[in-house]
Amino acid sequence: MRTKQILLAVLLVGSAVSLGGCVVAAVGAGAAGTVAYLKGDLEAVESRKLDEVHAATLKAVKELGLNVTKDSKDALSATVVARDAQDKKITITLRATTEQTTKLSIRVGLFGSEAKSRLIYQKIHDHLQK
């Protein structure tokens, strides 16, 4: 499990370096998994089951006062679509990569907002720690 996280971190950093200018990558260790902001999407990996990450996502969205317009989930993936006070569309996509690991993708608006994406991710991550 730990080997997979390290490999994923190396791949994300390698991708970020090879793609150049408009990429900001941050690689965390331990429970935080890996996080990268790439082309308007914040992508992260959490060492938690899809159901847990989905529940944390809904709590985070509610805590931030976002209006959920779509919430769909099956055994392998989930999508939460919300709108903020400026009516920007926020799409949070979750994919189970293993039984115990979930990949998140957060996009705010058409072009993305790194600051808002990171805030949403941090709230989701905080709820996973409770």
Specify the residue positions occupied by each region the protein language model found.
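Bacterial N-terminal signal peptides that target proteins for export
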Residues: 1-8
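C-terminal motif of bacterial Sec signal peptides marking the signal peptidase cleavage site
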Residues: 8, 17-21
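Repetitive helical segments and hydrophobic/amphipathic motifs
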Residues: 13-14
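Ser/Thr-rich, low-complexity intrinsically disordered terminal regions
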Residues: 23-130
